[in-house]
């Protein structure tokens, strides 16, 4: 932080509680300070006359504040090392407590600088108050509180304390003579004042009249009226004498001509500075203005808003008003009892519907493409209607497992098992895979991968039929031959 220079009378003057509970505590805990007014300096490495130049605040006061890290004299001890290169700081008196709401929050120790070697050093006028934190909450949390102390350094006048001693900077008028000269307050002999918008000007009347106060309770300054002044205004204005304020009428002239403060209220006086015809284009009472290109609102009579509406009393009292015909955006409560189009995402899950019409069809199951169907009845996928004579199509994955069907027609065929290509077949009876019809006179073809009869290892197969010419009449299936050629175990 750069050093800050304060005007005369402004100084950093915290109380003991503020030094301990705010500045020192936040420094120990590593928290940010709103104002970085205390420099961190190891004061025991410097001589007292060198420390004032290290302060952040250049107020010229004879009291300086520093954050000082604690350095122990011995590594295993608790005593602090307070020796400098040319002298040492010696404790004097007893520690004083810092009380906050009758609770001890810190301790103050007074030290005096001695020039030379201990214990024969020469006492000087440099005094330091060392503030340390003593917080019970931090003690219970085992937070170290001796990492930093606040040192307040000052130089007293002569030996011993002085009652009412002040350590503010001695005021020297020549130090402030080169500051920017502001406009002086007009005297009673010259009641006029020049108003220059380009400078910071304070307008004031000499008499203690309330009329010279602005809306914030202070003097009228250029900050209140600078926004109202034209940028090119260079005309000076003359303020009336306070004695003539009561008899001076309110003026509606622009601010560049006359500035007055009548009626003890500057807010109204500033509003009177404007010309309503030029500054504000408002509407007068009951006045309608015409602006080209802007359509003016139509002013209707009290009952005029009902013009053009039909007579509701003559209309039929029915509940079927076709307000929006053939509109999918229009929805009534009665529509919730029937399924809607699946594309809208609204449907009645308790009833099937025809996906092509979007209407409920109690005779047909749901369309398999919508994922909504009646699992209790099959349907023809081409028509979308229920067909009790046919099972579900195997392509849809929905079928009646209690009956086979012809995959080419999609209709139930009670005389034929399921097609093996579909993976759906009747395991209780064989069938001819070429015809798709049940053939009770022949076993299954072993090349199809279907169930093989135990007799299939010894019969002659000819296009899906038995060939009885290969065995004798008494043993048409060749059981004797199979037993004769049975390998030995």
UniProtKB/Swiss-Prot annotation:
GO terms for cellular component: nucleus. Transcriptional regulator that binds specific DNA sequences on the promoter regions of target genes. GO terms for molecular function: DNA-binding transcription factor activity; transcription cis-regulatory region binding. The NAC domain includes a DNA binding domain and a dimerization domain. Residues 105-162 bind DNA. The gene is NAC082. Residues 162-195, 416-489 are annotated as: Disordered. Sequence repeats lie at residues 333-345, 346-358, 359-371, 372-384, 385-397, 398-410, 411-423, 424-436, 437-449. Expressed in the epidermal cells of the root apical region. Residues 6-156 form the NAC domain. This is NAC domain-containing protein 82. Its main location: nucleus. The lineage of its organism: Eukaryota, Viridiplantae, Streptophyta, Embryophyta, Tracheophyta. Keywords: DNA-binding, Nucleus, Repeat, Transcription, Transcription regulation. Residues 183-198 are annotated as: PEST-like. It is found in: Nucleus. It holds the Pfam family NAM. Gene3D superfamilies: NAC domain (2.170.150.80). Residues 171-183 have a biased composition (Basic and acidic residues). It comes from Arabidopsis thaliana (Mouse-ear cress).
